[in-house]
Amino acid sequence: MRRLSCALFVVVVLLVGVPAGASAQSYNPITPTKANETITLTGKNMTVQQVVDIARHGAKVRVSAAHRQSSAANLELVLEGARQEVPIYGFNRGGGAEREVVIFEGDPLAPETAELLVQRRYDGFRLTGVHGGGEQHTGLGPEVADEEVIRAQMAVTLNRMRYSGMNPALVDLLIAMLNERIAPVVLSRGTDGGGDLAQDAAVRAAMVGVGEVHLRGQRMSARQALTTTGLRPLEKTVNSIGVYAGWGGHNSYTDGQAALLVHDAKQTLDWGDLVFAMSMLGLNSSVNPLTAVPQNIRAFPFVNWQARRLLNILRGSYLFELELDPNNPEDTHGQRLLQDPLSYRDYSQRNGSAWEAYSRLKKNLLIEINSGSSNPITKVGTHPTDSWELNTPWIKRYYVEPAGNTEGGFILGSANFDNTPLNDSMEQFTLALAQSYVGTLERTQRTFDPFFTVVRTVGSYGFLEGFPEDVQCNVPHADSFAMSDILGELKSLANPVPAEGNWTERGIQDVQGLGRAKVAKARLAVDNALYLISQELLSATKWMDNRRVQSPNRSFGAAPTAAWQAWRVISPCRQDPNERELSETWRINLPYSFLKGNPASNFLGAASGEPNAARVRYRTHRALKKARQRRKALTRLANQPVGRGGVVSRRP
C-alpha cells in the first residue's frame, strides 16, 4: 500500500507541476535524452529510429561525405545547365504560373546575374518576395505545439538535401540549428500536400534571422537564437545563401510526422499483441485457432505470422495444458470452452491485417524520406543512352553536357513531391487499426459473463464466487463508457480525407494530397488504440489475478508474467478503499502512461524474474506527465479543417 501511495504522490506532483496559467497554445519541448549521440545522415538509409532519436530525444546530426559531394555535384549541374541554356524550373525560369517566364540567360555567376539571383533567394527566404516565382506562402495557424514535429521535419529535409543542389553554408546551418535545438515557429496549416511549402518557409526564414523560434524550449526571435548560440544567419552572398537552393517540393513536415507515426504504431501493435495474449490467459482461452493446422490451410502471410507470434508469447502457459474438472476427471475440457467469442478467435486475422498495413506504411515511408522529391529533379551522371526516352529530342533538351566541374546529367521537371503512395498507406493503416481494435471493448465485456469465463463473480470488484475476498484483487475494471467514446472516435478517424481538386495557380495546381490531415488523423488513431489497449490491460490483469486465485500453480508464460508483474508495481492487487477516489482519477491516464513509458519490447524478450520496479515507476510517471499535453496536441492537429476554403500552396 505504501508503494501505491508513493507512486500516486509522484503522479500528483508531476501533474500539478504544469503551470495553471498555461495557454492552449503551450509548447511541448523534447527531453533530450540522446543529446550525447550523433547520427550521420547519408540521404540513402535514414531509419525510423534515427528520425525519432533526432526529433524526440535530441540526438545530434551530421551528414556523410558522400551526402555533401552529391549535393555539391547537383548544384554544379544546375549552374552549368543554366550556362548551356537548359530551361530550369524555378531558376532561369520562374515557378508556378510563371514557369515560362525567363528570369535570366547565360552564366548565373556573372556579377549582375548573381546579384539578381542572390537577392531573389534572400527575399524568398525572408518571405518578403517570391521564391522561384509564383506566390509566397506563410501558412495558417495554429502553431505546431510539439518540438519533436519540427525537428522531424528539419531532419528529413536535411537527409533529402543529398538529392538537391545546396550551398554548403546552408547545409551546415541546418545541421547547427538541429544540434543547438533551434526550432522555428511553424504554422500547422497552409499546405495541400504537394510540397509543404509554408512549413519549409518558416525554417528558411529562421536561417536568415527572420521570424521566431524556440531555443531549447524558450521562445525568442530567430536572430537572437542564432546570436546566442554563436551562429550567423545566412548572408546575401554567393557563398552563403547562394544563387540556387533546390529546396522546393519537400513534404518533410508531413513525412517527419509519418516517421513518428510509424514508430508509435509499432509500439502500439506490440502492446496490442501482448495485452491480447494476457486477455486470453484471463479468459482461459482456446489456442486452437492459432495453431499450424488452421493457419497453414489459409496462407495469408501476416495472419500466419501473427498467430505464430501469439503462440510464442503464450508458450509455457497453462493454456496448453489440460483443464481437468476436479468434480469430473473424465472431462478433459474442464473449465476451458471449445470456442471463444469472435473478438478472441478473430484477433490473428484482424491484427495480422493491421501488421500488414503497417509493413506497407513503413516501406513507403522509408522510400519517401530517402528519395529526391524536389522539382526539378537533378541527376548527375545520367546520359541519353541510359533509356530510350532520354534519347528523344524533347527530353535531350534538358540534358546538360559534361563541362567545367560537372560530368553532366539531366535536369527534369517531376511530380516526385506527390505523396499519394505514403498518404494512401497511412489511411489504409488507420482503417486496419480500427478494424482490429474494435475487439478491445468486446473482450473486456465478455469477462463479466460466466457463459465465457465459466466462473461467477460477485460485487463491484468482481470477486470470484466461493473464494475468500481478502486474497483477491480489489482493482478497477476497464471503463466501458470511456472505451466506447474512444472507440467511436477511432472509427471516425478511419474515414478517409476526401480527394481534393481546387483550382490554384491559374490551374497548374488543380489537385491536392492533404497529407498533413491524413498523418494527423493516423497519429491520433494510434493514440486512441493505445488508450483502448490500456483499458484492456485492466481487464486482462484482473482476470490473470483471478485465474491465479483459482489455481496458484498456473503459469502464464514469461512475457505476460513480466508485464503483469510490472503493472502490479504501479497498480497493486490490493488497494486501500480510502484511496479509491484518487486511484479512479487515474483510471484512464495511468494505464495509458504505463504502456507509453514502458514499451512492450521490454517484456516480450523477458524470460523470467521480477521487473525493475523503480524503472517502471519512473517511465510510467514521466509518460503520465506528458500525456495530457500530447493528447491535446494530437487532437488539435487531427481536428483542423481541410479542403475548400483552406489555404493551399503553390505547386513546387
Question: What do the predicted segments below correspond to?
Answer:
Residues 8-17:
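Bacterial N-terminal signal peptides
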Residues 22-24:
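Boundary at the C-terminal end of the N-terminal hydrophobic targeting segment
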Residues 97-114:
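Glycine-rich loop at the start of a catalytic domain that most often binds anionic cofactors/ligands
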Residues 137-200:
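Contiguous domain-boundary segments centered on the initiation and propagation of an alpha-helix
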